[in-house]
């Protein structure tokens, strides 16, 4: 019996020591699913609303007791007796119960925790791995990891404007080999930075956060580490960037406030990226190269470099089918970043990914900077055959647990496991 008999929500802590929400869903046959919700530091304006208590006397206003209360009250009552295998019905019931366009009444964090926990409970009831339950017999593609090795922007207190510099070991023959390659680059980068006298303290996502002199020094340090680790930039290990441009878009200008204070118009920002793509041919992907509502700038960027590299919309699309449809119709970007907590239910996440695939857009399943020990997104990446995952560096257990889950899945799939390599970026 996959009937829901009990739902329980609680407040726990994320990887930054901030409160977040966890939910347990119990079924009539004794099966149980548990899921915890991540939280972002650089959040898009159009994301579903994360409910916080606002009590400054407790966790500096970031408590999640009200979200947990909603789970234990309204949500538990509404879902009692429903079939956990009917994910669309479960998620639809919570959306209707909330009654707002952005899940702001009950909280997207409350709704998502229950949504994911329900899927886990249903998978447990069927004695099926989560990736297989969600994706069926065709779920066999392991993702190329985007490993964040230098942090800047809102993720680190340093002089780097661009938020993430990542390596993607696409030249590997398997996920486990790709992970090894990325880890070796990460450890080599530590030596490169130490030799130059830089700190090797890490940021929120486990990448290093040194006080580099410029954004150029950051990417060049990554390239140096790739080479010193014995790999070839652009041939078997690529560079992926997440500038998180909305974070430095002020008054209609892109302002590099952390480094040289330079300002750029949208046209100049596009030219900046075009120059980087020419100068650094190892660049495979740029995420949020333009601000979330700079649609004209995004269109120009897509027309300028979209045929050469992957252009990922994160704050632009916020895993939202409505915004993604607008982008597809306008010829903007060619890839979507998938963050389950941006939209707030598993059903809507899967709908956005399907829409992207139908339009020939790639998809990158992603963590948030405030993570938990829940490896749900590892299973999601395999379930959807996304081919790419972005889940931090080779440090911090909140990041490593996703990689370890992917290793387990690859082992379980055996000879049927597929590693897409460079094909992951094909459209």
Curated annotation (Swiss-Prot):
Q: How is the cofactor bound?
A: Binds a second Mg(2+) ion via substrate during catalysis.
Q: Catalyzes what?
A: (2R)-2-phosphoglycerate = phosphoenolpyruvate + H2O
For binding Mg(2+), which residues are annotated in this chain's numbering? Answer: 242, 287, 314
Please, one GO biological process term? glycolytic process
Q: What is its EC number?
A: 4.2.1.11
**First-listed, main subcellular location of the protein, grouped into a coarse class:** cytoplasm
Quick one: which residues bind (2R)-2-phosphoglycerate? Answer: 163, 339, 368-369, 390
Q: Name one Pfam family in it.
A: Enolase_N
Q: Return the GO cellular component terms, semicolon-separated.
A: cell surface; extracellular region; phosphopyruvate hydratase complex
Catalytic residues, per the record, are 205, 339
Location comes to: Cytoplasm; Secreted; Cell surface
User: Which cofactors must be present for this protein to function?
Assistant: Mg(2+)
* EC main group: lyase
Gene3D superfamilies per UniProt: Enolase-like C-terminal domain (3.20.20.120), Enolase-like, N-terminal domain (3.30.390.10)
Which keywords does this chain's UniProt record carry?
A: Cytoplasm, Glycolysis, Lyase, Magnesium, Metal-binding, Secreted
Tell me the GO molecular function terms. Answer: magnesium ion binding; phosphopyruvate hydratase activity
SMART domains per the record? Answer: Enolase_C, Enolase_N
UniProt xrefs under InterPro entries: Enolase, Enolase-like_C_sf, Enolase-like_N, Enolase_C, Enolase_CS, Enolase_N
Pathway entry: Carbohydrate degradation; glycolysis; pyruvate from D-glyceraldehyde 3-phosphate: step 4/5
Domain of life per record = Bacteria
Matching PANTHER family: ENOLASE
- Entry function: Catalyzes the reversible conversion of 2-phosphoglycerate (2-PG) into phosphoenolpyruvate (PEP). It is essential for the degradation of carbohydrates via glycolysis.
UniProt similarity note: Belongs to the enolase family.
Q: Which HAMAP family match?
A: Enolase
Could you tell me what this protein is called? Enolase
- The record lists the organism as Solibacter usitatus (strain Ellin6076)
